[in-house]
Amino acid sequence: MQYGFGAPVSGALSAPETLSRVATEGEAMGYDYITISDHVVIPRDIEARYPYSDTGEFPGRSRGDRHEQLTAVAFIAGATSRLRLVTSVTVVPHRPAVLQAKMLATIDVLSKGRLTFGIGAGWMKEEFEALGVPPFPARGAVTDEYLQACRELWTKDNPQFDGKYVKFANVLFEPKPVQKPHPPIWVGGESGPALRRTAALGDGWYPIGTNPQHRLDSMKRFAAGVERLRRLTREAGRDPAKIDLAYRVTNWGRSLPARADDGERRLFSGESADIVGDLRALRDIGVGHVDFNFGGDTADAMIAGMRRFREDLLSRV
Protein backbone atom coordinates (compact mmCIF):
# COMPACT_ATOMS: atom_id res chain seq x y z
CA MET A 1 0.00 0.00 0.00
CA GLN A 2 1.21 3.49 -0.84
CA TYR A 3 0.65 6.54 1.35
CA GLY A 4 0.32 10.20 0.45
CA PHE A 5 -0.03 13.60 2.09
CA GLY A 6 -1.60 16.89 1.10
CA ALA A 7 0.47 19.85 -0.08
CA PRO A 8 -0.18 23.18 1.67
CA VAL A 9 -1.22 25.29 -1.33
CA SER A 10 -3.04 28.02 0.59
CA GLY A 11 -2.26 30.22 3.56
CA ALA A 12 1.07 30.87 5.24
CA LEU A 13 2.43 27.37 4.66
CA SER A 14 2.13 27.81 0.89
CA ALA A 15 5.15 30.15 0.75
CA PRO A 16 7.74 28.77 -1.70
CA GLU A 17 10.30 27.75 0.90
CA THR A 18 7.67 26.11 3.12
CA LEU A 19 5.89 24.26 0.32
CA SER A 20 9.23 22.98 -0.95
CA ARG A 21 10.31 21.90 2.53
CA VAL A 22 7.11 19.99 3.27
CA ALA A 23 7.36 18.18 -0.07
CA THR A 24 11.03 17.26 0.23
CA GLU A 25 10.80 16.18 3.87
CA GLY A 26 7.73 14.06 3.11
CA GLU A 27 9.68 12.44 0.31
CA ALA A 28 12.65 11.79 2.61
CA MET A 29 10.35 10.17 5.21
CA GLY A 30 9.24 7.62 2.65
CA TYR A 31 5.78 8.88 1.69
CA ASP A 32 4.90 7.78 -1.83
CA TYR A 33 2.89 10.68 -3.21
CA ILE A 34 1.78 14.23 -2.60
CA THR A 35 -1.69 15.57 -3.40
CA ILE A 36 -2.41 19.06 -4.73
CA SER A 37 -5.93 20.56 -4.64
CA ASP A 38 -7.60 22.78 -7.22
CA HIS A 39 -9.41 26.10 -6.98
CA VAL A 40 -8.55 28.88 -9.40
CA VAL A 41 -10.60 31.50 -7.56
CA ILE A 42 -12.77 31.53 -4.44
CA PRO A 43 -15.94 33.59 -4.92
CA ARG A 44 -16.76 36.00 -2.12
CA ASP A 45 -20.31 34.64 -1.87
CA ILE A 46 -20.88 30.91 -2.28
CA GLU A 47 -24.36 29.42 -2.39
CA ALA A 48 -23.25 26.05 -3.76
CA ARG A 49 -23.08 23.31 -1.14
CA TYR A 50 -19.69 21.78 -0.45
CA PRO A 51 -20.14 18.00 -0.86
CA TYR A 52 -17.88 16.92 2.01
CA SER A 53 -19.33 18.59 5.08
CA ASP A 54 -22.62 18.00 6.85
CA THR A 55 -23.40 21.72 6.81
CA GLY A 56 -22.49 22.21 3.14
CA GLU A 57 -20.11 25.02 4.07
CA PHE A 58 -16.78 25.09 2.24
CA PRO A 59 -13.99 25.22 4.88
CA GLY A 60 -11.72 27.27 2.62
CA ARG A 61 -14.30 29.91 1.70
CA SER A 62 -12.46 32.69 3.53
CA ARG A 63 -9.11 31.94 1.87
CA GLY A 64 -8.51 33.43 -1.55
CA ASP A 65 -4.74 33.08 -1.21
CA ARG A 66 -4.13 29.77 -2.93
CA HIS A 67 -1.86 28.68 -5.75
CA GLU A 68 -3.08 27.60 -9.16
CA GLN A 69 -2.94 23.82 -9.08
CA LEU A 70 -0.90 22.81 -12.12
CA THR A 71 1.66 25.56 -11.56
CA ALA A 72 2.08 24.29 -8.00
CA VAL A 73 2.45 20.71 -9.28
CA ALA A 74 5.26 21.84 -11.59
CA PHE A 75 6.96 23.66 -8.70
CA ILE A 76 6.79 20.57 -6.48
CA ALA A 77 8.05 18.39 -9.33
CA GLY A 78 11.16 20.56 -9.53
CA ALA A 79 11.78 20.29 -5.79
CA THR A 80 11.44 16.49 -5.57
CA SER A 81 12.80 13.46 -7.38
CA ARG A 82 10.71 10.44 -6.36
CA LEU A 83 7.29 11.53 -5.03
CA ARG A 84 4.37 10.92 -7.32
CA LEU A 85 2.36 14.06 -8.01
CA VAL A 86 -1.40 13.57 -7.65
CA THR A 87 -3.87 16.27 -8.66
CA SER A 88 -6.53 16.02 -5.97
CA VAL A 89 -8.55 16.67 -7.91
CA THR A 90 -8.33 18.72 -11.09
CA VAL A 91 -11.70 20.25 -11.90
CA VAL A 92 -11.58 19.24 -15.54
CA PRO A 93 -13.96 21.87 -17.01
CA HIS A 94 -11.90 24.73 -15.51
CA ARG A 95 -9.20 24.60 -18.21
CA PRO A 96 -9.56 24.27 -22.00
CA ALA A 97 -8.99 20.67 -23.04
CA VAL A 98 -6.05 21.18 -25.41
CA LEU A 99 -4.21 23.53 -23.04
CA GLN A 100 -4.90 21.23 -20.11
CA ALA A 101 -3.58 18.20 -22.00
CA LYS A 102 -0.44 20.13 -22.93
CA MET A 103 0.22 21.32 -19.38
CA LEU A 104 -0.22 17.82 -17.98
CA ALA A 105 1.98 16.22 -20.65
CA THR A 106 4.67 18.81 -19.92
CA ILE A 107 4.53 18.07 -16.19
CA ASP A 108 4.79 14.35 -16.85
CA VAL A 109 7.83 14.84 -19.10
CA LEU A 110 9.64 17.26 -16.79
CA SER A 111 8.93 15.12 -13.71
CA LYS A 112 10.12 11.99 -15.54
CA GLY A 113 6.76 10.27 -15.41
CA ARG A 114 5.53 11.02 -11.90
CA LEU A 115 2.08 12.52 -12.59
CA THR A 116 -1.24 10.98 -11.56
CA PHE A 117 -4.21 12.88 -12.99
CA GLY A 118 -6.89 12.91 -10.30
CA ILE A 119 -10.05 14.40 -11.78
CA GLY A 120 -13.51 15.64 -10.85
CA ALA A 121 -16.39 17.45 -12.50
CA GLY A 122 -16.57 20.23 -9.89
CA TRP A 123 -19.16 21.44 -7.42
CA MET A 124 -18.83 25.23 -7.05
CA LYS A 125 -21.18 26.90 -9.54
CA GLU A 126 -19.91 30.39 -8.73
CA GLU A 127 -16.34 29.43 -9.63
CA PHE A 128 -17.47 28.11 -13.02
CA GLU A 129 -19.22 31.42 -13.67
CA ALA A 130 -16.14 33.44 -12.69
CA LEU A 131 -13.92 31.44 -15.03
CA GLY A 132 -16.20 31.74 -18.05
CA VAL A 133 -16.09 28.02 -18.77
CA PRO A 134 -18.89 25.82 -20.17
CA PRO A 135 -22.10 25.99 -18.13
CA PHE A 136 -22.13 24.37 -14.70
CA PRO A 137 -25.10 22.04 -15.48
CA ALA A 138 -23.07 20.52 -18.34
CA ARG A 139 -20.02 19.81 -16.19
CA GLY A 140 -20.36 16.02 -16.31
CA ALA A 141 -20.61 15.87 -20.09
CA VAL A 142 -17.80 18.42 -20.42
CA THR A 143 -15.57 16.39 -18.11
CA ASP A 144 -16.11 13.18 -20.08
CA GLU A 145 -15.47 14.90 -23.41
CA TYR A 146 -12.35 16.72 -22.20
CA LEU A 147 -10.93 13.45 -20.87
CA GLN A 148 -11.52 11.77 -24.21
CA ALA A 149 -9.86 14.72 -25.96
CA CYS A 150 -6.84 14.53 -23.64
CA ARG A 151 -6.42 10.84 -24.38
CA GLU A 152 -6.59 11.54 -28.11
CA LEU A 153 -3.85 14.17 -27.83
CA TRP A 154 -1.68 12.03 -25.57
CA THR A 155 -1.81 8.84 -27.62
CA LYS A 156 -2.32 9.66 -31.32
CA ASP A 157 0.25 10.86 -33.85
CA ASN A 158 -2.42 12.79 -35.75
CA PRO A 159 -4.94 13.73 -33.04
CA GLN A 160 -8.40 14.83 -34.11
CA PHE A 161 -11.56 15.41 -32.12
CA ASP A 162 -15.01 16.62 -33.08
CA GLY A 163 -17.15 16.95 -29.98
CA LYS A 164 -19.78 19.30 -28.63
CA TYR A 165 -17.41 21.18 -26.32
CA VAL A 166 -14.02 20.69 -27.95
CA LYS A 167 -12.93 20.36 -31.57
CA PHE A 168 -9.45 20.15 -33.05
CA ALA A 169 -7.56 18.83 -36.06
CA ASN A 170 -4.39 19.77 -37.94
CA VAL A 171 -2.30 19.87 -34.76
CA LEU A 172 1.10 18.52 -33.79
CA PHE A 173 1.07 17.54 -30.12
CA GLU A 174 4.51 16.77 -28.73
CA PRO A 175 6.04 15.73 -26.48
CA LYS A 176 3.71 12.97 -25.42
CA PRO A 177 3.59 12.01 -21.74
CA VAL A 178 6.40 9.78 -20.50
CA GLN A 179 3.93 7.29 -19.00
CA LYS A 180 2.24 5.04 -21.53
CA PRO A 181 -0.37 5.23 -22.72
CA HIS A 182 -0.77 8.33 -20.50
CA PRO A 183 -0.64 9.37 -16.82
CA PRO A 184 -3.08 7.34 -14.71
CA ILE A 185 -6.51 8.94 -14.43
CA TRP A 186 -8.00 8.66 -10.94
CA VAL A 187 -11.67 9.63 -10.86
CA GLY A 188 -12.74 11.45 -7.72
CA GLY A 189 -16.30 11.36 -6.42
CA GLU A 190 -18.73 8.97 -4.83
CA SER A 191 -21.94 9.48 -6.84
CA GLY A 192 -23.40 7.26 -9.52
CA PRO A 193 -22.01 9.45 -12.33
CA ALA A 194 -18.54 9.36 -10.74
CA LEU A 195 -18.63 5.56 -10.54
CA ARG A 196 -19.80 5.29 -14.14
CA ARG A 197 -17.05 7.70 -15.22
CA THR A 198 -14.49 5.56 -13.42
CA ALA A 199 -15.82 2.41 -15.06
CA ALA A 200 -15.75 3.93 -18.54
CA LEU A 201 -12.72 6.24 -18.50
CA GLY A 202 -10.73 5.84 -15.29
CA ASP A 203 -7.61 4.01 -14.26
CA GLY A 204 -8.49 4.40 -10.59
CA TRP A 205 -11.30 5.38 -8.21
CA TYR A 206 -10.40 8.09 -5.69
CA PRO A 207 -13.29 8.76 -3.26
CA ILE A 208 -13.54 10.59 0.05
CA GLY A 209 -15.56 8.84 2.74
CA THR A 210 -17.35 11.87 4.18
CA ASN A 211 -19.78 12.90 1.43
CA PRO A 212 -23.13 13.10 3.31
CA GLN A 213 -25.04 12.17 0.16
CA HIS A 214 -22.88 9.14 -0.63
CA ARG A 215 -21.12 8.09 2.55
CA LEU A 216 -18.24 5.62 2.36
CA ASP A 217 -17.23 5.96 5.99
CA SER A 218 -17.61 2.31 7.06
CA MET A 219 -16.08 -0.81 5.56
CA LYS A 220 -19.56 -2.12 4.76
CA ARG A 221 -20.40 1.00 2.75
CA PHE A 222 -17.02 1.19 1.03
CA ALA A 223 -17.12 -2.51 0.11
CA ALA A 224 -20.56 -1.98 -1.42
CA GLY A 225 -19.18 0.94 -3.44
CA VAL A 226 -16.29 -1.20 -4.67
CA GLU A 227 -18.64 -3.99 -5.69
CA ARG A 228 -20.86 -1.53 -7.56
CA LEU A 229 -17.81 -0.13 -9.35
CA ARG A 230 -16.68 -3.60 -10.37
CA ARG A 231 -20.12 -4.39 -11.76
CA LEU A 232 -20.22 -1.14 -13.75
CA THR A 233 -16.70 -1.77 -15.03
CA ARG A 234 -17.67 -5.21 -16.32
CA GLU A 235 -20.77 -3.70 -17.96
CA ALA A 236 -18.49 -1.16 -19.67
CA GLY A 237 -16.49 -4.04 -21.15
CA ARG A 238 -13.42 -3.48 -19.00
CA ASP A 239 -11.55 -5.58 -16.46
CA PRO A 240 -12.25 -4.45 -12.86
CA ALA A 241 -8.81 -5.71 -11.84
CA LYS A 242 -7.31 -2.92 -13.98
CA ILE A 243 -8.98 -0.20 -11.88
CA ASP A 244 -6.84 0.95 -8.95
CA LEU A 245 -8.53 1.82 -5.66
CA ALA A 246 -7.49 4.85 -3.61
CA TYR A 247 -9.04 6.44 -0.52
CA ARG A 248 -8.68 9.99 0.75
CA VAL A 249 -8.82 10.63 4.52
CA THR A 250 -9.56 14.16 5.71
CA ASN A 251 -9.98 13.51 9.47
CA TRP A 252 -9.05 10.70 11.82
CA GLY A 253 -8.61 9.77 15.47
CA ARG A 254 -10.51 10.01 18.72
CA SER A 255 -12.35 13.21 17.77
CA LEU A 256 -14.47 11.27 15.25
CA PRO A 257 -17.64 9.41 16.29
CA ALA A 258 -16.87 5.73 16.77
CA ARG A 259 -19.87 4.67 14.68
CA ALA A 260 -21.03 5.67 11.24
CA ASP A 261 -24.75 6.28 10.91
CA ASP A 262 -25.21 2.80 9.42
CA GLY A 263 -24.22 1.42 12.83
CA GLU A 264 -20.88 0.10 11.64
CA ARG A 265 -17.47 1.18 12.88
CA ARG A 266 -16.51 4.52 11.37
CA LEU A 267 -13.31 4.25 9.35
CA PHE A 268 -10.30 6.03 10.86
CA SER A 269 -11.95 6.75 14.20
CA GLY A 270 -10.48 5.73 17.53
CA GLU A 271 -6.96 4.88 18.61
CA SER A 272 -3.85 4.13 16.59
CA ALA A 273 -4.53 0.39 16.67
CA ASP A 274 -8.01 0.98 15.22
CA ILE A 275 -6.62 3.05 12.36
CA VAL A 276 -3.96 0.44 11.62
CA GLY A 277 -6.77 -2.11 11.46
CA ASP A 278 -8.71 0.07 9.02
CA LEU A 279 -5.70 0.39 6.74
CA ARG A 280 -5.23 -3.38 6.77
CA ALA A 281 -8.92 -3.90 5.98
CA LEU A 282 -8.74 -1.47 3.07
CA ARG A 283 -5.62 -3.19 1.80
CA ASP A 284 -7.39 -6.55 1.97
CA ILE A 285 -10.26 -5.29 -0.19
CA GLY A 286 -7.81 -4.07 -2.84
CA VAL A 287 -7.06 -0.45 -1.91
CA GLY A 288 -3.53 0.40 -2.99
CA HIS A 289 -3.32 4.09 -2.07
CA VAL A 290 -4.43 6.09 0.99
CA ASP A 291 -3.63 9.74 1.65
CA PHE A 292 -4.10 12.06 4.59
CA ASN A 293 -4.41 15.77 5.29
CA PHE A 294 -1.93 16.91 7.94
CA GLY A 295 -2.59 20.22 9.66
CA GLY A 296 -0.29 22.51 11.58
CA ASP A 297 0.22 26.21 12.12
CA THR A 298 3.88 25.96 11.14
CA ALA A 299 5.95 23.83 8.81
CA ASP A 300 7.68 22.30 11.84
CA ALA A 301 4.34 21.23 13.32
CA MET A 302 3.06 19.79 10.05
CA ILE A 303 6.26 17.87 9.36
CA ALA A 304 6.37 16.55 12.93
CA GLY A 305 2.81 15.28 12.56
CA MET A 306 3.67 13.55 9.30
CA ARG A 307 6.69 11.89 10.90
CA ARG A 308 4.76 10.71 13.98
CA PHE A 309 1.97 9.32 11.83
CA ARG A 310 4.37 7.42 9.63
CA GLU A 311 6.41 6.02 12.53
CA ASP A 312 3.54 5.27 14.91
CA LEU A 313 0.87 4.02 12.49
CA LEU A 314 1.97 3.41 8.94
CA SER A 315 5.01 1.39 9.99
CA ARG A 316 2.65 -1.10 11.67
CA VAL A 317 0.49 -1.85 8.65
Please place each PLM-identified region on the residue numbering.
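Active-site-adjacent structural elements that line small-molecule/cofactor binding pockets in enzymes
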Residues: 1-317
